[in-house]
Amino acid sequence: MLDEFLGGLDGTPSCIMGNNKLISKLRACARRASMYQVTKDNWGNQVENYGSIPFVDMKTKPGTNDEVVGIDDDAGTTSLYVARLAMDGLHAVSFAGVAPVQIWLPDFSTAGAVKKGEVEMNAAIALKASKAAGVFRNIKVK
């Protein structure tokens, strides 16, 4: 079913994203299908792949232990997300005439050990081709 889902996209996705439980099950399936590969990125980090597509564990929300991609407790299902990151697929955008990252530094000429500054990021995403991203819902993991 995963190959059928990936085949419905307009190209090879840049990543397969989900929660830890789903990624673990996909990893096991990929091993059985001889599609599991482990490579190292430019920084020496181990990257697990389904063929040439890296698995991405979305982990938990900052400051909590809640999964970014949750599991429905009643049905025991979750969702799988894929995206082809490219200028003609899914990519980041910033507002016209505004720098994506704005920085306000504190006044270092005043006395005091504690200074206050700000950093603001203005960004959004654009999906240029509807088949460049997809979600596979209701995958049983429990």
Predicted feature locations:
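Extended amphipathic alpha-helical segments with heptad-repeat/coiled-coil character used for oligomerization
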Residues: 10, 14-16
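Structural motif
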Residues: 18-21
